[in-house]
Amino acid sequence: MGAGFNPNAGLGMLFVGLARAAFEETLEYCKQRVQGGKPLVEHQLVQRKLFDMLTKVETARAYARAVMLYNASNPLGLGYYSNASKVYATQVAFEIASDGVQLHGGMGLAKGILIEKLFRDARAGLIEDGANDSLALLAAPTMITSHAY
């Protein structure tokens, strides 16, 4: 592992991609699925849910990108930023995939449906390469003592 490199920063970016895929898959489904005489995407509550999903995706993307740029320009890096990127991005990916399953209705958990696969992968991300709670507990003391937030 080179200076400034932490694999969790890369996982943050990977799971931002998963979250984005779950959002896009859900948006397309909501454009096609008709409920109550109109596409799901035309229902206000669905629009609100899609808005929240995209906001979370873009927030996670911005943070994960900032961590990658920070690590690239600082030879020692800050491991807790990388851990925070992984923790935040995997949590967002899980939430987005879960919302996607919900908006897909009964089809959301059917084998062979992309959103179901994304949901399973997002769930695995919460424990992959260190469970999120463990990574947060590992990083918290350094964050507190360095005051670099």
Regions found by a protein language model. Give the residues of each.
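Glycine-rich beta->alpha junctions and the first turn(s) of the following alpha-helix
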Residues: M1-E58, G125, H147-Y149
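Short, conserved micro-motifs enriched in small and acidic residues
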Residues: N6-M13, G17, G79, N83, ...
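Generic, well-ordered alpha-helical scaffold segments in large soluble proteins
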Residues: A22-Y29, A66, D99, L118-D121, ...
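C-terminal helix-coil-helix/basic helical segment that borders enzyme active sites and/or dimer interfaces
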Residues: L27, K31-K38, L54-Y88, V101-G106
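Charge-rich, acidic-biased intrinsically disordered regions
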Residues: E42, V46, G79-V87, G108-D121
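Hydrophobic alpha-helical segments of membrane proteins
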Residues: V92-G100
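Glycine-rich phosphate/cofactor-binding loops in nucleotide/flavin-utilizing enzymes
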Residues: H104-Y149
